[in-house]
Amino acid sequence: MTTSSRVKALLELTSTDQSTFAAAFGMTTPQAMSNKLRRDSWSAKDLAKAAELCGARLAFILPDGSQLILAPD
C-alpha cells in the first residue's frame, strides 16, 4: 500500500473532504492534490499535518509501547 493510498484511506475513514484537505495544504486547484497523490510525494511534515487535519496523530510506536508523536510544526 502506497503512502497516498493510506492518505486516501485516512480521508475516507474520517469523512474528510478532499477539497478541504487540499485547501489546508495551500492547493487552489483539484489537480494539485491529484498530482501530489499520483506522485506519492509526502514528507513527514505533510503526513503529520494530514493526521492533524483528520483529528489523528502520526507517531512511531516502539516495542515497549512508548510513542514518539510527530507534529506538523
Label the predicted regions.
Residues K45-I61:
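DNA major-groove recognition helix of helix-turn-helix/homeodomain DNA-binding modules
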Residues D40:
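Major-groove DNA-recognition helix of helix-turn-helix-type DNA-binding domains
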Residues S15-M33:
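Short alpha-helical DNA-recognition segment
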Residues L11, A22-A23, A51:
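The alpha-helix within a helix-turn-helix
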Residues A59-D73:
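Short, charged recognition helix plus adjacent turn
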Residues K8, D17-T20, A48:
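Residues within the helices of the helix-turn-helix
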Residues M1-T14, I61:
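A short, Lys/Arg-rich alpha-helix, primarily the initiator
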